[in-house]
Amino acid sequence: MGKFLATLILFFQFCPLILSDYSPSCCTLTIGVSSYHSKPCNPAQPVCSWTLDLLALSADQALQPPCPNLVSYSSYHATYSLYLFPHWIKKPNRNGGGYYSASYSDPCSLKCPYLGCQSWTCPYTGAVSSPYWKFQQDVNFTQEVSRLNINLHFSKCGFPFSLLVDAPGYDPIWFLNTEPSQLPPTAPPLLPHSNLDHILEPSIPWKSKLLTLVQLTLQSTNYTCIVCIDRASLSTWHVLYSPNVSVPSSSSTPLLYPSLALPAPHLTLPFNWTHCFDPQIQAIVSSPCHNSLILPPFSLSPVPTLGSRSRRAVPVAVWLVSALAMGAGMAGGITGSMSLASGRSLLHEVDKDISQLTQAIVKNHKNLLKIAQYAAQNRRGLDLLFWEQGGLCKALQEQCCFLNITNSHVSILQERPPLENRVLTGWGLNWDLGLSQWAREALQTGITLVALLLLVILAGPCILRQLRHLPSRVRYPHYSLINPESSL
């Protein structure tokens, strides 16, 4: 009898642990068309936590709002408190009357059209506490501006609730659903790139193998080509494999997916096969079948012939271009100097027009301020008339509009200096040097021409030489050691 009781006690102790492995491991919060998984939680670990952003929740709910014409959340509501309202499935009995309070239970459901919730339209406007929900035990939250942390007991996962910002006239609301679910499966970790070095390292060192391949390649081309090897990325390597050697059917791990794999049944190699290639998955695997050889891609280029060094003389085209540039610069300098004389008088006339426009804008701004004061008086009077209905905006069921008139732009417009002092007359960096306008323009044109001439003399011969040798470089063929179309 004692052994039976001991076995029964052990069974009831370990039974919750066994069943908890098959229970849902998280709580999923849904708003609009988006879902948020909580941290791992279950009956053994009942606290389900979320860290949410109110701006992101508003964007999610805007795709599928519970009510039309909801006022969205913005930084305007950063200073207002946030309230949480559970939605009841069963309506409890009402005891007593009066206004709703935290000790009274009544179903709080979202009704459309939603025109803004005040403190008396829902039974819970602060810490949630009722015979069904306890604020600290079942649900609690903390708010830091737009950042929201929610802790929900796992037993309450499956009930909807609402979040409300109690801002008069601006009451954004979020309607959230919760349901138990499983955490998404964790993706298997990828094989680190650093582990490929010792896995892909053959018995013969890479240095000896590559030197042997390069030596054989040079001998086959009679030392008339240059061998270029690229070992930058393992994914670009090539594979030669023998189809005569089969791959074991046991499960193996793919190590490398090469960019090119070619069968070589009758190829004579200077050394043995070092790796295992599976043709079905086109990858190097961890099985020790030794039917392949991996090598980095390398190419062949003919050795360029040595030519005589050409004489570095300035061609006639350089002098011709320099002369044309100097002539164009002088013509542009003269034309620009002549336009400065007429430009000064034009600036004076434009400055007069701007002054008259500024005076007209200032007068209109003063009239607008008077109209704004008149509208504000009427607004205050209408708010007093509709005081019992919550103000004019609540009575009209519209958003409140306000005027934002500032004097900063008008004052800046009046303080700006004359246009002639703000416009550069063509002389860069506003140098004066005590010279007249004509002398400054002539000096600037001369400096520009000298700089252009030096640039053409220094860079012109190099550019022409590169262009002259470009056709001969394009004609050089490019050979690849591994060609898919060649027969091995």
From Swiss-Prot:
Disulfide bonds join C225-C228, C225-C401, C393-C400. Residues 313-333 are annotated as: Fusion peptide. It comes from the Viruses. InterPro entries: TLV/ENV_coat_polyprotein. SUPFAM superfamilies: Virus ectodomain (SSF58069). Residues 341-387, 397-429 form a coiled coil. Residues 464-488 are cytoplasmic. GO terms for biological process: fusion of virus membrane with host plasma membrane; symbiont entry into host cell; virion attachment to host cell. CDD domains: HTLV-1-like_HR1-HR2. GO terms for cellular component: host cell plasma membrane; membrane; viral envelope; virion membrane. A motif (CXXC) lies at residues 225-228. A lipid is attached at C462 (S-palmitoyl cysteine). The record marks R312, A313 as: Cleavage. The chain crosses the membrane at residues 443-463. Residues 1-20 form the signal peptide. PANTHER family: ERVV2 PROTEIN (PTHR10424:SF81), VIRAL ENVELOPE PROTEIN (PTHR10424). The mature envelope protein (Env) consists of a trimer of SU-TM heterodimers attached by a labile interchain disulfide bond. HTLV-1 lineages are divided in four clades, A (Cosmopolitan), B (Central African group), C (Melanesian group) and D (New Central African group). The surface protein (SU) attaches the virus to the host cell by binding to its receptor. This interaction triggers the refolding of the transmembrane protein (TM) and is thought to activate its fusogenic potential by unmasking its fusion peptide. Fusion occurs at the host cell plasma membrane. This is Envelope glycoprotein gp62.
